């Protein structure tokens, strides 16, 4: 009995299914092997240690850390930088003289080791101050202080308010130079006018007062100063700071009064005056007709044809020469004399 056509067809289908279930194509095997190899390599990469560098003798991971002047610091922000031995994030922080500060709003600047906002603050000699504001403000520094040059003066590195029509400084004080004087280093004297003047630290009117050794005193008639006091030149003399009653012929000889008719004042010494000795020679009186005064010493002219002074001595110029202040005899000239 021969198999039918339907039976043969069924056998072919069954044989085809069996072949498909138990066959392994070579290209599929190659793909699976390649996938396994890549997975192993990826795992090996994840497990490999990160490269390390040295910073001051200490190893660090450059992916998470950075070396700042020999100090290992963490990386902060997207573009970290070093501030001396510290790391910082320049997008939110500032490095001011080696110190990390949070960046302020506005125009961020450094004032010494601190950060400040230049829109609202001002740095004066390393000190952060509030900046002067207003439509007419002229902000600036006065020493270590902030001031407004439109309404203030800077007096001795200190801000003071402007006063009057001619504001000026008197030490650390402000004053109106049209109505006051600055006397001494910092004293404001409230005097004015063409006769206003200073007497030490005080102001005074020169029409009514005198300044005697920094003392302001009422002015007497024909008044003048004698030391620290006033006196009347009508009735008194002032002899080197000493007041003396004024006589008809009284004069001063140092701090002493003397009669100018019968006395002489010779180099601060009162000596008798006579018709024979009417003038001074040093601290004594002498007669210029009969005597010669040489360096404060009186010599008689007797015996000299042409009496002449040579230093502190007298000599006869007809028989000698004066060589270097010494009378020298029997020489034609002083040349060659030692």
Curated annotation (Swiss-Prot):
It is found in: Secreted. Residues 30-50 are annotated as: Disordered. Residues 1-23 form the signal peptide. Residues 30-47 have a biased composition (Basic and acidic residues). Component of the acid-insoluble organic matrix of the aragonitic skeleton (at protein level). Initially, expressed in an aboral submarginal ring and then along calcifying septa. Keywords: Secreted, Signal. InterPro entries: Galaxin-like, Galaxin_dom. The keyword Membrane does not apply. GO terms for cellular component: extracellular region. It comes from the Eukaryota. This is Galaxin.
């Amino acid at each position: 009995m021969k198999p039918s056509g339907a039976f043969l067809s069924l056998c072919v289908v069954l044989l085809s299914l069996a072949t498909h279930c138990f066959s392994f194509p070579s290209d599929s095997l190659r793909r699976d092997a390649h996938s396994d190899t890549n997975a192993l390599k990826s795992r090996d990469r994840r497990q490999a240690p990160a490269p390390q560098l040295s910073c001051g003798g200490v190893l660090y991971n450059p992916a998470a850390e950075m070396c700042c002047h020999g100090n290992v610091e963490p990386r902060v922000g997207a573009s970290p930088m070093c501030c001396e031995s510290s790391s910082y994030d320049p997008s939110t922080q500032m490095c001011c003289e080696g110190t990390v500060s949070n960046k302020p709003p506005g125009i961020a600047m450094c004032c010494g080791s601190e950060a400040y906002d230049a829109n609202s603050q001002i740095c004066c000699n390393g000190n952060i101050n509030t900046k002067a504001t207003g439509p007419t403000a002229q902000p600036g520094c006065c020493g270590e202080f902030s001031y407004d040059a439109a309404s203030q003066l800077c007096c001795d590195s200190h801000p003071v308010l402007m006063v009057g029509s001619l504001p000026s400084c008197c030490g650390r004080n402000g004053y109106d130079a049209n109505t006051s004087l600055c006397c001494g280093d910092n004293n404001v004297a409230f005097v004015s006018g063409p006769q206003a003047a200073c007497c030490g630290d005080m102001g005074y009117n020169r029409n009514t007062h005198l300044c005697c050794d920094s003392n302001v005193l009422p002015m007497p008639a024909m008044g003048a100063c004698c030391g620290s006091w006033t006196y009347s030149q009508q009735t008194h003399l002032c002899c080197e700071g000493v007041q003396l009653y004024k006589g008809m012929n009284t004069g001063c000889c140092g701090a002493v009064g003397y009669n100018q008719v019968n006395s002489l004042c010779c180099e601060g010494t009162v000596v008798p005056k006579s018709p024979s000795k009417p003038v001074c020679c040093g601290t004594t009186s002498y007669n210029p007709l009969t005597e010669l005064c040489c360096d404060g010493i009186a010599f008689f002219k007797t015996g000299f044809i042409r009496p002449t002074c040579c230093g502190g001595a007298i000599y006869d110029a007809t028989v000698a020469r004066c060589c270097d202040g010494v009378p020298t005899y029997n020489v034609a000239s002083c040349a060659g004399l030692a």
